[in-house]
Regions:
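Conserved SGNH/GDSL esterase-like catalytic core that processes O-acyl groups on lipids
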Residues: 1-48
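His/Asp/Glu-enriched short active-site or ligand-binding loop at hydrolase and phosphoryl-transfer sites
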Residues: 108-116
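Histidine-centered active-site loop/cap adjacent to the catalytic His
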Residues: 119-140
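Loop/turn elements at helix/coil->beta-strand transitions in domains of secreted/extracellular proteins
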Residues: 27-32, 78-83, 106-109
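A solvent-exposed, charged loop/short amphipathic helix patch at secondary-structure junctions
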Residues: 43-62
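Well-ordered, non-membrane alpha-helical segments in soluble/globular domains
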Residues: 14-18, 57-70
């Protein structure tokens, strides 16, 4: 999950994107690809509201404020990296729309994936190939 809320309301603060994001910029990447929101949607994590500053620890338990926190970090720390946010198909509308709005606010490229083959809401092997094809076409 992007946020600290996982399946069945479990605390995922030890493995959420907001915890792991600090490891991504260690190697000065040319491109950062974020594929987030799938588990937040399927786990019924709280969606929350877009929040562009003043985050609290309780905000990190909702998807959209956590997404904004993460995008703020990446755009501030990885200024020379191309950042692309992949949004899975078939997510809750409020998550898709919120992440899209957050990307627009932070100037992050956003790819809305289409017709991805899935198993239990996650891309199958065929779906991963479809994602690769869509991302390759997007960054050309």
């Amino acid at each position: 999950t992007i946020c600290n809320t996982g399946y069945d309301g479990a605390d995922y603060s030890d493995r959420a994107f907001t915890k792991r994001m600090f490891n991504v910029t260690a190697g000065d990447p040319d491109m950062i690809v974020i594929f987030g929101g799938t588990n937040d949607s399927w786990a019924n994590a709280p969606v929350g509201e877009l929040k562009f500053n003043g985050w609290t620890s309780s905000d990190m338990y909702s998807c959209l404020p956590s997404c904004c926190f993460m995008l703020e970090y990446f755009t501030a720390v990885a200024k020379d990296s191309q950042i692309v946010f992949l949004i899975n198909s078939e997510l809750k509308d409020e998550i898709t729309e919120g992440i899209t709005a957050a990307c627009r606010h932070y100037g992050v490229q956003c790819l809305l994936l289409k017709d991805i083959d899935k198993i239990w809401g996650h891309p199958s092997i065929k779906g991963m190939a479809q994602i690769s094809d869509q991302l390759t076409e997007f960054i050309k």
